[in-house]
Regions:
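P-loop NTP-binding module
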Residues: 1-224
Length: 224
């Protein structure tokens, strides 16, 4: 495919000491923990060779399973791949957390675009030095299901697909909200993050049944 040309975005320099320590792709890039995310990146790149895999939802059954941490680490690793342009979207609009984890301050985000108060270009931030781009969540909202299900989100996804090779979508918990299912149906693939020793097997099974099999990339076991 032809190389994608990106517009100029606001840039933010990431400082390792300000980010969430579990973002090992940033804080411990040479550790064995980070190696697990390299393996996950390899899995995604390998799958991409045989099927369209551009927009990927990272979801969990319940809150606090590590899906946002997994999404950022994966996106950071993809962005460091030669020639790959990657965007991560915070679509967990009831509790947006990606900007806080990364130690960045944002004024606009996905909720503002959905509300029609800013453009996609104005809300995306380029994170140096990894070349990862982020579309933060913006202001927390309660009418998320309606916004995510509407035509505006489809437009946003179409627009960012034209700009980036990979779009990683941090979704709300699947076991609680319907938004994640809507997101998965608009994406090309999904992975489920499960916290070891915490998530009930029955809950995971129930959630997996709600994900179309052809979109399921696998289950990520979070040991932290």
């Amino acid at each position: 495919p032809a190389e994608k040309t990106l517009p100029e975005f606001t840039e933010w320099e990431i400082e390792a000491e300000r980010v969430e320590p579990r973002l090992v792709a940033i804080t411990q890039p040479h550790s064995t923990y980070c190696e697990e995310y390299r393996s996950l990146r390899t899995h995604v790149l390998h799958k991409s060779q045989t099927k369209k895999l551009q927009a990927i939802v990272v979801a969990s059954t319940n809150p606090s399973e590590g899906k946002s941490i997994t999404a950022i680490n994966l996106a950071w690793m993809l962005a460091q791949t030669d020639g790959v342009k990657c965007l991560i979207i915070d679509s967990d609009l009831r509790m947006p957390s990606l900007a806080d984890y990364l130690g960045i301050e944002t004024e606009k985000g996905l909720s503002d675009i959905l509300a029609g108060t800013c453009s996609v270009k104005d809300a995306i931030i380029k994170l140096a030095p990894a070349n990862l781009h982020i579309l933060p969540g913006g202001e927390a909202r309660s009418d998320v299901a309606e916004l995510i299900s509407g035509p505006k989100f489809k437009e946003i996804l179409r627009e960012v697909r034209d700009m980036f090779d990979y779009v990683i979508i941090d979704a709300p918990p699947l076991g609680i909200f319907t938004d994640a299912t809507v997101l998965i149906n608009q994406a090309d693939g999904a992975m489920l993050v499960v916290r070891a020793g915490r998530t009930r097997y029955s809950a995971v099974t129930r959630v997996l049944e709600s994900i179309p099999r052809e979109r399921m990339l696998g289950v990520v076991l979070n040991q932290s």
